[in-house]
Each structure stands twice: as structure tokens, then as C-alpha cells.
Amino acid sequence: ADGFISCVAALCAIRICPAVKDYVITSHKSKEPATMIILEALDIPVFLDCDMCLGEGTGAVTIYPILDMALAVYGGMCTFSDNQMENYVPLV
């Protein structure tokens, strides 16, 4: 969901078919005053808070490269054993 209007549409879709929630990505928190009400109702984490306004359409364009990078790191990062290192152990 990219901003207020698409978050409202996502909430409507979820109310019709709750399974839809598993497929909704909320890209950013819009500056629209009602956005927080909708986001609280959706109960889905928001990735960005960049003061973007209604209708810009930049949230989705911004979030997908970030998701691609995160997946690349997750899928391609070496493990401790790959690097012949001991596993991390918290000090406390």
C-alpha cells in the first residue's frame, strides 16, 4: 500500500478477505491526517516515514529497491561457520 488511499483500499480488501493481509506491504506513512488511523487498523509495520504527500506514488518506488537489497543480503550473506568463526554469544 502506497500512502493513504491505497492503505484504505488494503483495509477494505482485508475486511472482505482477511487472508489478503499476508500480502500487503505498507511502503510509507503519508502526511495525510487520517493515515495513522488506517495504519493502526491495518496493524502492519510501515517501512518509511519521509513526509510524502497524497498522490505522489513514490512510496512503492522507494521501498522495492530496499526490499531487494534486504533479500540479497539475507540470501547471500556468509554465516559464522562459512567464515570459520565461532558463533556470536551475548555477553550479558
Regions found by a protein language model. Give the residues of each.
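A generic structural signal for tightly packed, nonpolar segments enriched in small/aliphatic residues
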Residues: G3-V92
